[in-house]
Amino acid sequence: MAKLKVTLTKSIIGRKKDHIATVNALGLKKIGKSVMHEDTPQIRGMINKVSYLLNVEEI
């Protein structure tokens, strides 16, 4: 299964509470920080929900 590198590129200040919770659930706290995740349907759904805040690369 492929890996995804997810990077927070925009601030979560002033965003909807469920979007903030989704970003936090992905393990992202600060702008510019990245985390690695397995490419699963659950992770893809979270990424799609807040895609306007993230940069995603397949590895």
Swiss-Prot record:
What is an example of a GO molecular function annotated in this UniProt entry? Answer: structural constituent of ribosome
| Keywords tagged on the record | Ribonucleoprotein, Ribosomal protein
What is any Pfam family matched here? Ribosomal_L30
The UniProt entry, under InterPro entries, shows: Ribo_uL30_ferredoxin-like_sf (IPR036919), Ribosomal_uL30_bac-type (IPR005996), Ribosomal_uL30_ferredoxin-like (IPR016082)
Q: Give the GO biological process terms.
A: translation
GO CC, any one term: cytosolic large ribosomal subunit
- PANTHER family referenced in this protein's UniProt entry, alphabetically: LARGE RIBOSOMAL SUBUNIT PROTEIN UL30M (PTHR15892:SF2), MITOCHONDRIAL RIBOSOMAL PROTEIN L30 (PTHR15892)
Q: How does it assemble?
A: Part of the 50S ribosomal subunit.
Protein name (database record): Large ribosomal subunit protein uL30
**Phylogenetic lineage:** Bacteria, Bacillati, Bacillota, Clostridia, Eubacteriales
